[in-house]
Amino acid sequence: MSYPVTSQPQCATTSCYQTQLSDWHTGLTDCCNDMPVCLCGTFAPLCLACRISDDFGECCCAPYLPGGLHSIRTGMRERYHIQGSVGHDWAALTFCLPCALCQMARELKIRE
């Protein structure tokens, strides 16, 4: 004889925590706040991307992989609890790559 399931098992306690999301310390267009980073992002963006990847703790070749920079930027947002979305990350890196790289480099300098 089988007994019908009338309710699903539930957790006795729920632990919920909220983390406060913050903004990037500098804006996307604040490139001139750090002139060496600005120059590197303008004239050697792949070198800056490799440095960002290395400083973030990833392989320095990650920016050369498809989606590598996107995953680093998204990982940076998640690690530092910066508000935004994958779509915003994609748009920043697709339409304004040098500015996005400079913003990421400045954020790492400030946070580390």
UniProtKB/Swiss-Prot annotation:
Abundant in the cervix. Moderately abundant in the uterus and fetal skin. Expression is markedly increased in psoriatic skin (18.5 fold increase in comparison with normal skin) and its overexpression alters the protein composition of cornified cell envelope (CE), but does not affect keratinocyte differentiation. Expressed in the granular cell layer of epidermis in uninvolved psoriatic skin and in the psoriatic lesions it is found in the upper-spinous layer. Signal peptide: none annotated. This is Cornifelin. The keyword Cytoplasm applies. It is found in: Cytoplasm. Part of the insoluble cornified cell envelope (CE) of stratified squamous epithelia. Directly or indirectly cross-linked to CE proteins loricin and involucrin (IVL). GO terms for biological process: keratinization. Belongs to the cornifelin family. GO terms for cellular component: cornified envelope; cytoplasm. Keywords: Cytoplasm, Keratinization. InterPro entries: PLAC_motif_containing (IPR006461).
